[in-house]
Amino acid sequence: LTVSYTLRLLMSTLLAALSTRAGCLVLVGRVGPVWQVDAPSIRRFLAAWRRSPIQMIRMGEFGFRALTLAVFYRHMRSAAEAIGYPWGRTDDWKTPPKADEQEAIPPYEYRFLNEELPSTPTEAPVDVHADVVIVGSGCGGAVVAAYLAERGLQVVVVEKGMYVSADKMPQTQSFGLDQMFERLGFVPTSNLSLAILAGSGFGGGSTINWGATLMPRHYLREAWSQRFGMPYFQSSLFSHDLHACARRMGTTDDVTHNRANSLLMLGAHRSGQPAQVVPQNNAHRPHYCGKCTFGCTAGHKQGTVMTWLQDAAQHGAQFLTHCEVDRVIMDRGRATGVEATVRGQQRVRVHGRRGVVVSAGSLNTPAILLRTPALRRNQQIGRHLHLHPVAFVHGFYDKPVRPWQGAALTTVSNAAELVDPQGWGAKIEVMASAPALYCALLPYHDHVEHKSLAFRYPYSYTAIVIVRDRDAGRVKLDRAGRAL
C-alpha cells in the first residue's frame, strides 16, 4: 500500500522502537526486540494499545491492524475463499432473478496515443498538440471531452491510470484495488481520521462506483445557489442537464434488489421510515453484478468508458493513459498545456491551443494546480474540500445474505437526511462488500473473535451511514508532491 508521509512516519517510529530492547519494554512491557516476544504477550499489548489514552498509540494499533488485514485478505485467495467469498470473475449477472439470461455488451475498441510514443524513453519531451487538453477521464472530464469533440474541437484526454476492457477484467480484490483505485485503495488523511476511496483508472470513479444515480436534493441545490451565488443550480437548465446525463447512462429505477438491499427496504418499511429505490445507470438492463466495484465485466454499468468517452472517441478525441500530469504550462497568465510523465519514464508536453481542463478529481486537481509555480500564490487552491464521511455498521443474520451478490446499491433510507433543518443529515445505504474491507473494519478483541467474525462473512450485512460533510478540509502536497 502507498500511504501518507504522516502514517509512514508514525508506523516507522513505532516499528523502530519495537525493534529495540528498551523501546519494546516501554511499549509492550517485555524485553525485546518484538519478534522475540511470545504471541500471547503481543496480543495483550495490541489490546492495551487500543485503549491507550495516547492518540499516537491508538493510531498505531489501528494502522497495524487495518493495514495488515486489508493486505492479507486482498491477496490471500485461500483466506478469502475460506470465509465464503468467490474469487475472481463471477457470472451472477448472466442469470439475474426473475429476468431473462443476459449477454455482455461488447467493449469499444479504443486507440491510445501511447502506441505512437517512442519505444524507449527520449531525453527531450515528446510534444502532443490539440485544441483542448483534458486532464482526467472520470465523470467531469469525460462529459467535457464528448461535448467539445462533438462540436469539432481536437481533444486529447490525459489519464494517469490504465485502461482495462470489460472482457479482460479479473474482478479480483488485488487487481481492482491495485489498478483501479487511487494509491491502491487507501488514501488516509494527514490526521488519520478518514481513509479515502477514489478511482484511478480510465473512466475514473465511474469505473469502480456502484452504479447508483441519485439526483441532488432540492435543499442541496438551494444551498449551492444561495450560498455560492450560482443561480444555475436552481434553474431548469441544471435540471435539463441532469436528466440529459441520466438518459445517456440509461438510468432506470426498474432494478432487482439483492438480499442485503431487500433487507434495508424491509427494515425501513417495518419501522415506518422512508426508503426508496436508487436508480441505476445500467442501460435498462437487470444489472445483477455484485463485483462492479472492481470493474464491470458485463459492460452493463454505464460509466464514462461505456458512454461519453466513446462519444468523444467517435468524434476524433485521442487518449493518453499511464500519463501523470506534473503541472500546468502557463503563458502570461493563460493555461496552454500540461507537462506529464508516461509510465514514470517518458516526459511529454500536451499543448492545448484553445485551453486546458483539469478534472482529475477532488484530490489530484488541486495537487496539479499546487505543483504549478504560477498558481501557488492562490491561497484558495486546495481549500473547501468536502467528502462523504462514512460509518460502517455490521450485523449478522441466521440465513445467508451473500453480500457480494447482486447490484450493490439499489436502496437508500432518508430517515436521517433532514435531522437538521438545513439538510446536514445522513443517508443509510448498503455497502458493496468484499473481504479486504469487511475484515479490516471488523471490531474485535482478539484473534479468536476475529476469526469467528470473519467466518460469518456470508451471513453479514453491512450498512453504511453517509454524512453530508459540513466543515471543509484542505488538500496540500506531501514531500513527494502528492495530494495530502
Predicted regions and their residues:
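Flexible, low-complexity segments enriched for small/polar residues
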Residues: 1-83, 87
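Rossmann-like flavin
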Residues: 39-41, 48-51, 55-60, 72, ...
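Extreme N-terminal leader/targeting segments of oxidoreductases
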Residues: 51-131, 150, 190
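Conserved redox-cofactor binding core of oxidoreductases
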Residues: 82-116, 120, 231-326, 335
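N-terminal Rossmann-like FAD-binding beta1-loop-alpha1 element of flavoenzymes
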Residues: 130-157
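Glycine-rich loop(s) and the adjacent beta-strand/alpha-helix scaffold that form part
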Residues: 147-172, 195, 201, 314, ...
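N-terminal FAD cofactor-binding segment of flavoenzymes
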Residues: 153, 160-219, 257-269
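FAD cofactor-binding and catalytic pocket of flavoenzymes
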Residues: 378-484
